[in-house]
């Protein structure tokens, strides 16, 4: 049976591998029965796929078809790692966060496999197996975080979002796939210690979806003044929290929640 994130984000180990201008890494494992139970009840995602672009695009002046640079980039990463499970690259402008994203049918897989698919405690960054990159109502990307002077931990900078001033300067997340780049605006930042409903994918109606989106917005630790509605498609970045205010909790996940505002 597939598992959503049975072991994730507690006690980070990491390694960095610089390839093609991006950094790829990460983490350790921890069993969490609660998250397994969520997935047992929720194993399918909404099927609201975006229209896929042609592999070739026309030059705006000549009308001649030219290769799709996004697809070429993803294919290059697949070849570099000899791994067909590369689905995109996630980044936050003017930050250290810039990582290739993988996806496997078993959500536990990349907790203990590296970018080459080899067994490794450092793992790597990955997309929830139920998500479809830059399509559907919700994408969830998992990455580990920890304290280290020697190892590069890309998602560690997410903890800077505890500071509203940092948020003001870093409101957007880019998620590139083989067809283009999705731009997402962050509207909520908070630490979850018990309620795992943010992982739900299936919603019976637009109204139930909007109720969920509004719930995520209301959980934010500060006001972002970003409006949301029932048409929004979300990207959630999840990592462990090392903030001392949440030290007493066993499970503590920092969630950075954003809505898609553009795709091109």
PLM region spans:
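Solvent-exposed, non-transmembrane regions of membrane-associated and secreted proteins
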Residues: 26-264
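N-terminal Sec-pathway targeting helices
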Residues: 1-13
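Hydrophobic alpha-helical membrane-insertion segments, chiefly the h-region
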Residues: 16-25
């Amino acid at each position: 049976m597939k598992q959503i994130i049975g072991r994730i984000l507690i006690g980070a180990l990491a390694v960095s591998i610089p390839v093609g201008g991006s950094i790829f890494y990460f983490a350790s494992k921890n069993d969490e029965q609660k998250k397994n139970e969520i997935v047992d009840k929720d194993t399918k995602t909404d099927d609201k796929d975006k229209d896929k672009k042609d592999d070739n695009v026309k030059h705006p002046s000549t009308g001649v078809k030219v290769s799709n640079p996004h697809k070429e980039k993803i294919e290059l990463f697949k070849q570099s790692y000899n791994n067909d499970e590369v689905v995109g690259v996630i980044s936050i402008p003017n930050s250290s966060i810039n990582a290739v994203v993988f996806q496997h049918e078993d959500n536990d897989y990349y907790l203990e496999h590296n970018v080459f698919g080899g067994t490794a405690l450092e793992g790597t960054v990955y997309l929830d197996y139920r998500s479809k990159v830059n399509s559907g109502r919700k994408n969830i990307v998992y990455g580990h975080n920890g304290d280290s002077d020697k190892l590069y931990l890309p998602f560690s900078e997410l903890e800077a979002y505890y500071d509203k001033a940092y948020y003001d300067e870093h409101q957007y997340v880019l998620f590139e796939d083989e067809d283009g780049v999705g731009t997402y605006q962050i509207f909520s930042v908070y630490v979850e210690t018990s309620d795992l409903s943010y992982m739900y994918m299936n919603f019976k109606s637009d109204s139930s979806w909007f109720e969920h989106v509004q719930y995520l917005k209301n959980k934010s630790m500060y006001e972002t003044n970003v409006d949301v509605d029932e048409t929004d498609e979300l990207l959630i970045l999840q990592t462990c929290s090392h903030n001392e205010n949440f030290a007493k909790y066993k499970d503590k996940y920092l969630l950075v929640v954003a809505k898609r505002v553009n795709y091109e």
